């Protein structure tokens, strides 16, 4: 199923990559997770309607709409780029016109990832290599503080992952590797074409 087709099904516009580069070396270029990758993730990993996913560096919001459409899950998109944030909000309006009662379950915030205040309902955190490991460490520490305040099992989902992220999670946190999801046909050519899911158990 191609990218344009899925966008049409969801009544959103997310195809295309960022032109140019961010001013800070800590933040990487926007590129949406391929729909084929998200399909494979859900083939092997369960997202429930009771879950609330936070996508850091959400761009135009593809993951939010996809997870709501497929699983009924709530989703929060965090995006520092004002243009992408506006496009995500436009997508939300378009999606809401076709999918009733979805606005309460999909939201976006325009802020730096480390400034997002983790909500006690947030339990799935998604990263498509959006920023440097220094920013990632700050975000993970915010997640851990939230779990200390409101105990719950949380998962971190990494796509096209950075070795620095893995090293930090495995050596400096209590997160444990729960699952690896390789993208058939793509992983064989590029070892980064996979998801790693880390969990923090109660």
What are these regions (language model features)?
Residues 50-59:
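Conserved class I S-adenosyl-L-methionine
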Residues 83-84:
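Conserved short alpha-helix immediately C-terminal to the canonical SAM/SAH-binding motif I
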Residues 74-79:
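Conserved SAM-binding motif I beta-strand of class I
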Residues 122-135:
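A short SAM/SAH-binding and catalytic strip from SAM-dependent methyltransferases
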Residues 1-49, 87-120:
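S-adenosyl-L-methionine
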Residues 61-65:
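Glycine-rich SAM-binding Motif I of class I
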Residues 135-194:
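C-terminal substrate-binding/active-site "lid" region of AdoMet-derived donor-dependent transferases
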């Amino acid at each position: 199923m191609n990218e344009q087709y899925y966008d049409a099904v969801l009544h959103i516009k997310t195809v295309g990559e960022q032109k140019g580069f961010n001013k800070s070396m800590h933040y990487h270029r926007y590129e949406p997770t391929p729909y084929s990758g998200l399909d494979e993730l859900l083939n092997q990993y369960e997202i429930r309607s009771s879950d609330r996913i936070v996508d850091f560096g959400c761009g135009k919001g593809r993951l939010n709409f996809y997870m709501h459409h497929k699983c009924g899950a709530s989703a929060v998109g965090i995006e520092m780029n004002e243009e992408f944030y506006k496009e995500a909000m436009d997508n939300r309006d378009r999606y809401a016109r076709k999918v009733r009662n979805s606005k309460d379950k999909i939201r976006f915030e325009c802020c730096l990832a480390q400034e997002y205040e983790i909500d006690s309902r947030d339990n799935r955190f998604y990263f498509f290599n959006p920023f440097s490991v220094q920013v990632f460490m700050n975000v993970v520490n915010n997640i851990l503080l939230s779990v200390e305040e409101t105990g719950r099992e949380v998962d971190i989902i990494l796509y096209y992952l950075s070795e620095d992220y893995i090293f930090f999670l495995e050596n400096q946190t209590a997160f444990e590797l729960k699952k690896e999801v390789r993208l058939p046909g793509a992983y064989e050519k590029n070892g980064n074409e996979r998801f790693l899911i880390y969990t923090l158990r109660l």
